[in-house]
Swiss-Prot record:
UniProt keyword Cytoplasm present: yes
Pfam families to which the protein is assigned, alphabetical: RsfS
Purpose of the protein: Functions as a ribosomal silencing factor. Interacts with ribosomal protein uL14 (rplN), blocking formation of intersubunit bridge B8. Prevents association of the 30S and 50S ribosomal subunits and the formation of functional ribosomes, thus repressing translation.
Protein name, as recorded: Ribosomal silencing factor RsfS
Superkingdom as given in the UniProt entry: Bacteria
GO annotation, biological process: cytosolic ribosome assembly; negative regulation of ribosome biogenesis; negative regulation of translation
One GO molecular-function entry: ribosomal large subunit binding
Length: 111
């Protein structure tokens, strides 16, 4: 499956998990380390959604590239690195503050 297809499948899984305002961005022309970024607002704790995304990604042969120990600050924003796909799980407050949607507004593939 292509990176585009995998990013779309991850976005669909996030929607099924009741994540809000899920967006897929094609960032390949703007960043050298990933092709797609999926950004989602997650109500509640992020770790359950993190696990679900990893399970869905594994179905497409994707594994987290740079997995690190998680800290308390990551209950506001977690970045999951699957190589060509970055998944940003954010609280509503973190999403409003960092405003990745504005940063990548010209790269939007799907909302």
């Amino acid at each position: 499956m292509s990176a585009n297809g995998a990013a779309s499948a991850v976005a669909e899984a996030l929607c099924d998990a009741r994540a809000e305002d899920v967006c897929v961005f094609d960032v390949s022309a703007r960043c050298g380390w990933a092709d797609f970024a999926v950004v989602a607002t997650v109500p509640g704790l992020l770790h359950g959604t993190h696990r679900l995304v990893c399970e869905q990604a594994a179905r497409f042969g994707l594994r987290e590239v740079h997995r690190k120990k998680r800290g308390l600050c990551e209950e506001q924003w977690r970045v999951l690195d699957f190589g060509s796909i970055l998944v940003h799980l954010m609280s509503a407050q973190a999403r409003a503050f960092y405003d990745l949607d504005r940063l990548w507004q010209d790269c939007l593939v799907a909302r």
